[in-house]
Amino acid sequence: MQEFSVSHLVFGSGAFSIVIVGLLAATSFVSWGVIVRKILLQRKTARANARFLAQFRKISHFAELQNLCRDEKVACPLRAISKGMLVEASKLSGRVSYDNLHHRAELIEESAQRCVETQRVVDAKYNGFLSVAANLSPFLGLLGTVWGIMDSLWSIGKHGSAELVVVAPGIGAALVTTIAGLLVAIPASGAFNLFSMRTNRNEVFYTNFGSHALAMFKRDELAAVESVQAKGTAE
């Protein structure tokens, strides 16, 4: 009795099935590389954010962010947002009044929003590939399935028999490509949804941080205006 291994089913079913399985194997390899890389990067980023946030909670003035932004050994989204706000603040004039206080705060807020959007793009990097892999892999597997069934039907016509030994190679190859497609799609789909959820969660986290930093800026600006007015009244 002839035995059929998985490798025999794949390599004995023709060049087309080999190409399909090869594409799925390459997609799986790249997908897992992306998944592992993003997991490690997210853990590293989370630790950097936690350290920066702990230091941020110790300060009470917006200008003190300068000291927190000096250490750039590890990439930190919160530091990037803070630097963007500080750069925008440095462009403002030194004249603060009740009339321009709102407009000054708006400029800082817009800068924070741009930084958050930039970080969202960074967080979502390679998510598109995982989405494509999750959506196309089952169809590649289905294509291999259809091809395997067609090969079995061709073998039946060629040999004039529907015995198992005749149809088994084609049917086996069809099942192998189907399984391969699912093995690629399931992890890619799960990872895509997980990373997308984390990207959305991080965006909210970064936006909230920007709001806290903006509130600190507003308090300092308001204190400066009140100080100037108090001096004018005293004089």
Label for each model-derived stretch:
Residues M1-A54:
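Hydrophobic membrane-targeting segments
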Residues F11, V21, K125-G128, V132-N135, ...:
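Internal alpha-helical transmembrane segments of multi-pass membrane proteins, especially GPCRs
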Residues A173-G190:
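Hydrophobic alpha-helical transmembrane segments of polytopic membrane proteins
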Residues G160-A174:
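Hydrophobic alpha-helical transmembrane segments and adjacent short intramembrane/lumenal linkers
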Residues R47-L140, W147-E163, G190-E235:
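Predominantly long cytosolic amphipathic alpha-helical stalk/bundle segments
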Residues V19-V36, A133, S137-L143, A180, ...:
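Lipid-exposed faces of alpha-helical membrane segments in multi-pass integral membrane proteins
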